[in-house]
Structures are given as C-alpha cells and as structure tokens.
Amino acid sequence: MEEKVTIRLIRNATLRIHYAGKEILVDPMLAGKGTLQSALGVYKTPRVHLTMPMNEIADGLDMVLLTHNHIDHYDPTVKQHLAKNILFLTQPQDKESITQDGFTNVES
C-alpha cells in the first residue's frame, strides 16, 4: 500500500510536507505577522498570520529544506523555534550563515 503524501501551506513559501515517513519543513518563515521589514523596505512582512500553531509547525520535524536564504524564506525567528540539531538542508552558499545561527546538522 502506498503511503499518502501530504503538503500543507503554512504561509508564503513555507510548507510542511509528510513524505516517505518523514516530516519536512520547507522555507521556514515563522515571524509574527507584520514584524519584519520587506526585502526592499516597502512594507511590513509577513503579511498574513501563520495558518497553524507554532507547536504544530515545529513538533515532530525530521528536517528543514531551505531553498535559499532570503528573509521571506528564512527569518531570524527560526532559530528560536526549531531544535538546533535538526537536519537542515540548504544551498552551499547558505550553509555558513545557518551554522552561525546555531544549527549543528547543516548539509548542502
């Protein structure tokens, strides 16, 4: 029997995916609505609230997939909400900055 794949949109590019028995968080933007400045400084971001409670986002994760390190894909609050030893998959050019944020299991 095939395992069901689930993809849940949390906000912006942030997704929680269940695939092959693993829980994957993609592009974690976890800051509160309107608490950050947009990349161009034009407006406050994120523009909408998270679609699920933080504990449902962070609990039981197996890994994080960061497509690229822009504020709308990875914000400063991520290091407050995720376990420091979680597997963090990212681009080679972003590995050092993720490690500097305290994450200890970063691969590219």
Where are these regions (language model features)?
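A short beta-strand/loop micro-motif in the catalytic core of glycosyltransferases
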Residues: 65, 87-90
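Pre-active-site segment of Zn-dependent metallo-hydrolases
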Residues: 22-65, 76-81
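A short helix->loop->beta-strand "cap" motif at the edges of active sites that frequently abuts
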Residues: 22, 84-87, 103-104
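Short gly/ser/thr-rich secondary-structure transition/capping motifs
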Residues: 5-9, 44-51, 69-70
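Active-site beta-strand termini and strand-to-loop segments that position acidic
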Residues: 17-20
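Short active-site oxyanion
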Residues: 4-6, 82-88
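Metallo-beta-lactamase
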Residues: 2-4, 90-108
